[in-house]
Amino acid sequence: MNTTPVIPADEAVIVMTRIYEAPRDLVWEAMTEARHVAQWWGGPGFSNPVCEMDVRPGGLWRHVMRFPDGHELKMNFVFVEVDPPRRLAWREVGHAERKGGLPSCLITVSLEDMGERTGWKMVARFDSIPERDAALAMGFIGPIAASNDRLVDYLRSL
């Protein structure tokens, strides 16, 4: 099943959903342990030479994503909410120093236990509808959908 986006006209959010063919505990582990995240984050051909995660409220997630052409994007996130294995929320920090970066948003991922399957719902909450629209214009959805496709393949390998 593909990642499905919903963009409400009257709310500064992007909502994406997907069903994973894996139990919730395994999906949670793959999303919260750096050794796993480094294997699937980013689109095809991307790698993650640095992925350090302190998964607790206030904890830092430091990430360097290498594009297929070799250039790197450094990202830092702070975890806002951690409720294993149900909810995980984070916000990028330091993005203002990065020229041309996406507008800041709070990402909240909810995992629904469906037995041997897991319902995944991501809500990206922006400060305003114009910021949300700017993120959409910059291609916000594509990389998340591509990462989710890689996560599907990675979960099959576990």
Predicted regions and their residues:
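Helix-adjacent hinge/juxtasegments
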Residues: L60-R91
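Short, highly charged C-terminal tails/helix-capping segments
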Residues: V50, R156-L158
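A short, structured loop/turn motif at beta-sheet edges
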Residues: R24-D25, V55-R56, V80-R87, S110-G119
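Hydrophobic/aromatic beta-strand elements that line small-molecule binding cavities or substrate pockets
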Residues: R18, V50-M53, M75-E81, E92, ...
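Beta-strand/loop substructures that line and gate deep hydrophobic ligand-binding cavities in soluble
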Residues: R91-G142
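Hydrophobic ligand-binding cavity/cleft-lining segments
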Residues: M1-S47
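Hydrophobic pocket/interface hotspot
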Residues: V27, V37, W61-H63, F79, ...
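Short beta-edge strand/loop motif at the mouth of beta-sheet-based domains
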Residues: V15, R35-E72
